């Protein structure tokens, strides 16, 4: 996806100790940023749709920034937490927003209540459940959550 210019992946490094004992970078976490247009469910209030779209309360699609593959290196899990990683992603999105606009951040969470609750606790609202077909032809449920920026 990176080579096709569909996304950008960011690494979070340990600024106090950039290299590990093998002289490799100490990668604490990573996340990917992209964009995506999502269809807004009819059950979303018109006032919310206008807030997300910026103009149209009847908008059917909203262009979003997509935070994907947010994760941390388990080796350094005591050094960094999910909120720091998420805040790093949002900081970059806010910079991009100043150049090209848009109002909404989207995450598509795995079907795990702890992960979903993490996003809700960080200002996201669950709007939809979708199903995708994985590379090995299995159906996987994802939860779409959005946050206004």
Q: Residue spans of the language-model regions?
A:
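Non-catalytic substrate-recognition and accessory regions of acyl/acetyltransferase enzymes
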Residues: 1-77, 84, 88-106, 110-149
